[in-house]
Amino acid sequence: MNTWNELTVHVNREAEEAVSNLLIETGSQGVAISDSADYLGQEDRFGELYPEVEQSDMIAITAYYPDTLDIEAVKADLADRLANFEGFGLATGSVNLDSQELVEEDWADNWKKYYEPARITHDLTIVPSWTDYEAKAGEKIIKMDPGMAFGTGTHPTTKMSLFALEQVLRGGETVIDVGTGSGVLSIASSLLGAKDIYAYDLDDVAVRVAQENIDMNPGTENIHVAAGDLLKGVQQEVDVIVANILADILIHLTDDAYRLVKDEGYLIMSGIISEKWDMVRESAEKAGFFLETHMVQGEWNACVFKKTDDISGVIGG
């Protein structure tokens, strides 16, 4: 009987995405996030904390490694690499690593206990694929299988991206999703009325996972998934481009985004830690965009830029 090692990292919430990616890089076959912020009794309002709910800055990220890997060596490697995160301006807090052994049957279902249906925005609720869930009036359901942890919709950067899509999509738009990951933003765009969505990711695994998630959601045949390096080689002009990726990468796509976004169209960017916000804003404005909306949740920033000659509705206009 095969066995697995379950490793849990207790880390500051700011480091969730970076640590999740690191766990996958070191051989984990999946990760699960346990975050007190996911259990608020009310809808998330992008930064407000409700006093009746006890909150913690620390989260638990649980990863699952096959027994063919030396878990002690993995833990030592992780400890060294996590220590380096502080040097890049990413606060990890007091990191704690715990591990235990699981048999195959435990692994098959254990990680699923971390995922429950989550109301992410006013209209959008993300539901694990194995859960029976009855939509309420006006509620749009995104079915997801978070097995490879490319983003399940609960991370602040994804939440703000979804909120921004709700803000700009009115129906009939064309959308490009750069670095689609799980495909959650593309699926949301389809549910919010976009006509055609083009989803790109450099990672072949992400392309496969995105397509699998898209296939779970009826009516999403208008999403076209392909491997791609940012916007290189893309010629399709669109109404909206959305990119939830690292700030250092975002600054390399703003010129191409301006070329591809139609007049009066939008560029949505997320995944920006606060210390790099000015750098991203300057890159977008230099390309020709005007800032319309700036959102902040904790140390994460997201923004909506507009390609327009009428600056009356933009920040500072």
Swiss-Prot record:
GO molecular function: protein-lysine N-methyltransferase activity
Enzyme class: transferase
GO cellular component, one term: cytoplasm
Reactions the enzyme catalyzes: L-lysyl-[protein] + 3 S-adenosyl-L-methionine = N(6),N(6),N(6)-trimethyl-L-lysyl-[protein] + 3 S-adenosyl-L-homocysteine + 3 H(+)
Binding site for S-adenosyl-L-methionine: 158, 179, 201, 244
Annotated EC: 2.1.1.-
Function description: Methylates ribosomal protein L11.
Protein name as annotated: Ribosomal protein L11 methyltransferase
Protein source organism: Streptococcus agalactiae serotype V (strain ATCC BAA-611 / 2603 V/R)
Lineage start: Bacteria, Bacillati, Bacillota, Bacilli, Lactobacillales
Gene designation: prmA
